[in-house]
Regions:
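N-terminal membrane-targeting/anchoring modules of bacterial envelope and secretion proteins
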Residues: 1-210, 356, 360-364
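Long, glycine/tryptophan/cysteine-rich extracytoplasmic
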Residues: 1-71, 111-116, 205-274, 320-344, ...
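N-terminal hydrophobic or amphipathic segments with adjacent small-residue motifs
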Residues: 94, 220, 227, 301-304
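Alpha-helical transmembrane segments of multi-pass integral membrane proteins
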Residues: 96-155, 190, 194-196, 283-368, ...
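Extracytoplasmic/cell-surface-exposed regions of Actinobacterial cell-envelope-associated
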Residues: 127, 167, 171-184, 199, ...
């Protein structure tokens, strides 16, 4: 597993570099004398190591390959560990992720030194080579380890709650900035489509046009960072040429199709609309921080922390995207202003947005008029409060009584008290009676 971590990505880079070098040399009918030197130079170029070719300094390396390499290293390290991996194994994985690339770098330095007599490639500075390679792979490996052990770091290491709460707003703010920069590049490229097409056709044959197109794709992240720097109010320079929101300066440019995004005339007033990119990112950042905390001080502090981190990252990428380009001069963005303006826009717009969100959440709800209470007599209250009496012998009783069914017992005859029969005058039943003569009248019928 450690061998895969050490040499998987590095081996793929060397394999791809070998393929590209061989295809290029064969396509131009060149001999294979300097193949190894070209492969070593490609290894240095994709790791942002400055090179000197034929006495010309080449320090502007494309960022797309290094981003792909970083993603591959982080993915490999992420798969090599899990939240339950012990710390000793984690250290070994991290060390292996650096050992492999540094070993390849040492070999590339030796090859470049030998090839310098055959081709015009000079061996780069060893300290710079090891520093760039180690820095790139350490950052990628550390990212992979953090992603793989995030749950463990949160639970066991006690990562503060405020740090965990700021991860999502930070990622979202960066995504908006990148998307805004990409939109600016796309619109500028569409506006200069004819110029870009003419630059592609300057390659003459199919191989040349494909090469120019491939180089444009590789340098696309560099151009995106330059566009984002201009959108924040900083300046992007390409030798004597420079671009900002309020001024432009012309100068010679290499025939690279992606450079058609650079304006051919003076600055336009409509360019101020590009400020919507950092302002929009700041507004959404403030909203995200305010949603996570109802305290305006906590929300504003969160905004400023994220803005500071984004400003530092912008400055680092701005530095990595530039460098020397031989006779064309230096390609660069004004690093300090790019980082500072990124921080300022995010902090100011984010603080305003957070304050508005917190204020709206704290605003009391409108009070509704309650109906006037009705005075109820005490007698009615007592009647309503008293439970309704249920009839005992009523036939319509709806309550269900659970009882056990038993055999019916014969009822004992009730002993009725003996009473003299009373003659009811209204009875319809015949009475059996004997007619007797009244006393003193026994000889004849009564008269």
């Amino acid at each position: 597993m450690l061998a895969a971590v050490a040499f998987k990505t590095s081996g793929l880079v060397v394999l791809i570099a070998t393929t590209l070098v061989l295809v290029t040399l064969v396509s131009v009918n060149s001999d294979l004398t300097g193949t190894l030197g070209a492969i070593a130079g490609t290894w240095f170029a994709v790791h942002l190591v400055p090179l000197t070719i034929g006495g010309t300094s080449l320090g502007v390396a494309p960022l797309l390959p290094i981003l792909i390499i970083g993603w591959s290293v982080a993915r490999t390290v992420h798969r090599a560990v899990d939240p339950d991996t012990d710390r000793r194994m984690v250290r070994w994985v991290f060390a292996a992720s650096l050992a492999g690339p540094l070993a390849v770098t040492a070999i590339a330095l030796a090859v470049a030194g030998d090839a310098s007599t055959v081709i015009g490639l000079s061996s780069p500075n060893a300290l710079a080579a090891f520093s760039w390679v180690a820095g790139v792979h350490a950052a990628a490996s550390g990212t992979g380890l953090i992603l793989a052990r995030w749950d463990s770091l949160v639970l066991r290491r006690g990562v503060p709650e405020w740090v965990r709460a700021l991860v999502a707003p930070f990622v979202r703010a960066l995504s908006i900035l990148v998307a805004g920069g990409a939109a600016v590049v796309l619109l500028a490229l569409l506006a200069s489509w004819e110029t870009a097409g003419a630059l592609v056709e300057s390659g003459r044959d199919v191989v040349g046009m494909l090469g120019l197109t491939a180089l444009s794709v590789l340098y696309l992240p560099n151009v995106l960072i330059g566009a984002l720097a201009v959108a924040t109010g900083s300046t992007a320079g390409f030798g004597d040429a420079s671009v900002s929101l309020f001024a432009t300066t012309g100068g010679p440019l290499p025939p690279l199709p992606i450079l058609a995004v650079l304006p051919e005339g003076p600055a336009q007033t409509i360019w101020v609309v590009m400020l919507a990119v950092p302002i929009g990112a700041g507004l959404l950042l403030g909203r995200d921080c305010a949603i996570r905390s109802a305290d305006i001080q906590v929300a504003a502090s969160s905004v400023w922390v994220v803005a500071a981190a984004a400003g530092v990252l912008a400055a680092l990428f701005g530095y990595a995207a530039g460098g020397s380009l031989g006779t064309f001069g230096t390609v660069e963005v004004t690093v300090w202003s790019f980082g500072l303006l990124t921080f300022a826009w995010l902090a100011v717009a984010g603080t305003i947005s957070a304050a508005i969100v917190v204020w709206r959440r704290a605003e009391p709800e409108p009070e509704h008029d309650e109906p006037a209470s009705t005075v109820v007599p005490a007698a009615e209250v007592a009647i309503e409060a008293a439970p309704a009496a249920e009839p005992k012998d009523g036939p319509d009783v709806e309550d269900v009584v659970e009882a056990e069914v038993v055999d019916e017992l014969p009822a004992e005859p009730a002993q009725e008290p003996v009473a003299e029969p009373a003659v009811d005058a209204d009875t319809d039943e015949p009475l059996d009676a004997e007619i007797v003569a009244p006393p003193g009248d026994t000889d004849g019928p009564a008269r």
